[in-house]
Amino acid sequence: WRVIHTGSGHLGLEVAKYYQELAYKQLKDINALKMHEPHIPKSLCYVSGQAFKDYIHDMEIVQKYAELNRKYIADTVIEKMGWHICEEFQTIHNYIDTKNLILRKGSVSARDGEKLIIPINMRDGSLICVGKGNPDWNYSAPHGAGRILSRSEAKDAVGIDEFRESMKGIYSSSVMESTIDESPMVYKPMD
């Protein structure tokens, strides 16, 4: 198996931030019409109506971009290596299943019989799994075990030497200061 783990290259975050700002502005406009303005954090504001439809539309474009990006990377590597594809599939995480309106943050689709990948960390690899289709879990599975440290905490707590030591025996061109926030020790262990 060869796994390509990449997303939209920051584009999804920019689209989400745009609509979060729009939601906050709409809330402020509504509150300006009222006497009492309750404080609602920006992160809890949401869009509705046409803005919601526009957001879903734009996120579909971002998700298609990420899918095509992974496909291009895979096709290029396969061609250059002279490999033959026996089977391929994509698993995406931190996205909106726009067909079923399921937000998957930290999870992946796991419909009954669906093949999926659950990445553990850069050292321990990924699990190739088959979905169970559990409606109580929104037909989802976890995207890995989760973080122990946030990205900023990891940069303060983990040194490059510790990172390199944890990756001994694993080939990677990505063990560097700028990827400390992805080092194995910032994630929960598999067990």
Q: Over which residues does each language-model region extend?
A:
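Domain-length cofactor-binding catalytic modules of enzymes
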Residues: W1-D191
